[in-house]
Every structure is written in C-alpha cells, then in structure tokens.
Design a protein with these regions (language model features):
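ATP-dependent adenylation/nucleotidyltransferase module used to activate substrates
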Residues: 1-135, 165-166, 173
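Catalytic subdomain that performs nucleotidyl-dependent activation
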Residues: 118-122, 127-191
Length: 191
C-alpha cells in the first residue's frame, strides 16, 4: 500500500511531470525525503546545496553527504558556500534572512543559467504553521497571514500539506538517510 506522502506527491506533480526541477537539498530529513520522492517518480531534477559555513565541520559534512548521495544516485549536484556571517554584517540583516537571501539568489541564478522550470524546496506543514505564527506575532497585515504559497511561477513546495512527523516516519520506513542539523534544536534563530 502506498504511503500518504507518495500519493500526495504523485498527485501534485502529475501536471508537472515533464518539467525540469532544481531541488534545494540541505541533507536534512525533509529535503532528503523530497529528493528520494523525485527519484522514485523518475522526475528530471538536479540538486542544489548551500554551505553557509555556520556550523564549521558539521556544515562541511552536510555538503559531503549531499554530494555523495548525488553521486550514488547519478544526479547532477550544484554546491556552493557562502561567508554568511560577513554577508549579514555587511547588509545589516539577521542570519536567517541573510542565508535566505543568499540561497534564493543563487537558486534563481541556477534556474536562469540552466533553464530549470521550478526551484523546489522541502517546506512542510510545520514550516507553514511556524510562518503563520511568526507573521501574526509580528503584526503583519492580511498578506502576512496567508503563509507560504505552495507554488509560484518559479518556486514549488510539494510537501506543504505533510507534517514533519509524517516526513520523519516516511524516512525511517523507507531507509532514507539524512543528517541532523544541530541548529534546528536551537532557539537562537527566529525564522
């Protein structure tokens, strides 16, 4: 019997099956499940990994992990690193905002250079709820309470209806390897 995630994923991607995707892969459980689903469904995709140099050896190990997965699965892998702290200092932005600005600019550059149809991220239901709560605490207007859009003309987030627990369970049940980012358990960053 197919898992809920597989059914939802297949249904969402049915209309886009002939597209060429660039998947943002950190090495964490969400993005590794996403990459595995793309692979399982024989979709055309490449992987993009950002090393923000924020966790020293751990960041480098994530980069190597993603690179090795791509080699093992015969997938094109784009990888880059940023001096995130310096960028944030120079642009007077927080780490989360700076890292987001850096990665999305790079993803969009890759999309334009290589002709990808969509940039795909592994945002999930928990991210959607977190965004809604943060925006409501900040006092945003109605536009801020909408949350993360599933699809725009350039971005696609097919896991937005799936919870983090469901993704983690799917990874365990399907022997999908991933890396745990120690900063995820920290309260240092407001996303």
């Amino acid at each position: 019997m197919k898992h809920k995630i597989e059914k939802v994923f297949k249904e969402k991607l049915k209309a886009l099956k002939d597209s060429n995707f660039l998947i943002a892969v950190s090495g964490g459980v969400d993005s590794m499940v996403l990459a595995s689903l793309f692979r399982k469904n024989n979709l055309k995709f490449s992987v993009a990994h950002c090393n923000f140099k924020l966790r020293s050896d751990e960041s480098d190990a994530d980069e190597l992990f993603v690179s090795n997965w791509c080699k093992e699965n015969n997938q094109k892998c784009f990888s880059t690193s940023f001096n995130t702290v310096e960028f944030c200092k120079n642009n007077k932005v927080g780490i989360q905002e700076g890292a987001r600005n850096l990665r999305y600019k790079w993803f969009h550059d890759l999309k334009e250079i290589y002709g990808f149809d969509f940039i795909v991220t592994a945002h999930n239901l928990n991210d959607q709820i977190e965004t809604y709560l943060i925006n409501s605490m900040r006092g945003t207007g109605l536009s801020g309470l909408v949350g993360i859009p599933e699809k725009t003309d350039k971005l696609y987030r097919p896991l937005l209806d799936i919870s983090k627990n469901e993704i983690s369970e799917y990874a365990v049940n399907n022997n999908i390897k991933f890396r745990e980012d120690s900063s995820n358990s920290s309260n240092d960053y407001l996303r």
